[in-house]
């Protein structure tokens, strides 16, 4: 049983709150007058895990980071630039990513395979290595919340807000911390997609266990958000575990295993929701919960299909309770359903029960749809499994942002 009481949100916590981590974010000239280079550094080689974009076109930094992690399953630094994706840049791009790793290793005095690199921004433009070389040489990470917040700014592209979260848990009677930071606003349809997330913890956990756990949690969190249905070339989630919390190694046999898993899931879920809420041009966060499914996978598939529907998203933007778009989207799913047993609730107001329309107050519904967080609940009445997905409305501003992205 998960000891929920032993997990507490740390207000104003950051990626440097767990023991052993420092960070920095700075402006080096990749973007106009904004921070665009950052680093997270650990005092000791940290167990790590990562998941990557499923886009068949994978950017050079992903290939280099995969190489680093595959060597020992440990990392001690992550270097990230924004403003340039270093994707679809050929062999030169791969060489530049390896050089970026080497520069970081030399600057921080680390083995090259202890350094991960990540890039985000415009695709198909060579990375300006003179700027990168000079920039990495200026990085001086600190164990201060201010520098952690600077890092969260340095990884942004079209995002309007930074995305950070932190939790404290109790394992073996000791305080253990876990925190995360993310970027992502457009081209979000993960499995991963234009999103980067970096998670730090002082938990004592080995690479293989952490990798399995992160992969499973990602399927329920980051892979269940969608902004515009596009997948990117650069995206990844990396977890670094310093092991400095003085607990026994955490694994599936540990008495507090579920506590750690729950805390990691909360961090991932918080960041996933923040990404959905900050979708390009978004004015509303949409959460879809599907109940009564035969399997969790079927529930998640339908939830994500609803939240990704352009017609549903535009209806929510227009504050229009057009539940017909929701039921139509459910019917388009590859999941076999019973068309006569579906319930739909919008903002806690029943609009469909056993697939029959329900009377409701248009005035009350209009008022509730003016809220910034919109909840759609669907019960299929086919089984006991559930699944959720998150997204945002689709506005005129989304078109404006993406039409003018390079300019």
UniProtKB/Swiss-Prot annotation:
SUPFAM superfamilies: DmpA/ArgJ-like. Its EC number is 2.3.1.35, 2.3.1.1. Substrate binds at residues 157, 183, 194, 280, 402, 407. Keywords: Acyltransferase, Amino-acid biosynthesis, Arginine biosynthesis, Autocatalytic cleavage, Cytoplasm, Multifunctional enzyme, Transferase. It comes from the Bacteria. It catalyses: N(2)-acetyl-L-ornithine + L-glutamate = N-acetyl-L-glutamate + L-ornithine; L-glutamate + acetyl-CoA = N-acetyl-L-glutamate + CoA + H(+). Its main location: cytoplasm. Pfam families: ArgJ. It is found in: Cytoplasm. InterPro entries: Arg_biosynth_ArgJ (IPR002813), ArgJ-like_dom_sf (IPR016117), ArgJ_beta_C (IPR042195). The keyword Acyltransferase applies. One of its GO terms (molecular function) is glutamate N-acetyltransferase activity. GO terms for cellular component: cytoplasm. The active site is at residue 194. The keyword Flavoprotein does not apply. The record marks 193-194 as: Cleavage. Gene3D superfamilies: arginine biosynthesis bifunctional protein suprefamily, ArgJ beta chain, C-terminal domain, L-amino peptidase D-ALA esterase/amidase. It is an enzyme of class 2 (transferase). Pathway: Amino-acid biosynthesis; L-arginine biosynthesis; L-ornithine and N-acetyl-L-glutamate from L-glutamate and N(2)-acetyl-L-ornithine (cyclic): step 1/1; Amino-acid biosynthesis; L-arginine biosynthesis; N(2)-acetyl-L-ornithine from L-glutamate: step 1/4. Heterotetramer of two alpha and two beta chains. Catalyzes two activities which are involved in the cyclic version of arginine biosynthesis: the synthesis of N-acetylglutamate from glutamate and acetyl-CoA as the acetyl donor, and of ornithine by transacetylation between N(2)-acetylornithine and glutamate. This is Arginine biosynthesis bifunctional protein ArgJ. It comes from Bacillus cereus (strain ATCC 10987 / NRS 248). The gene is argJ.
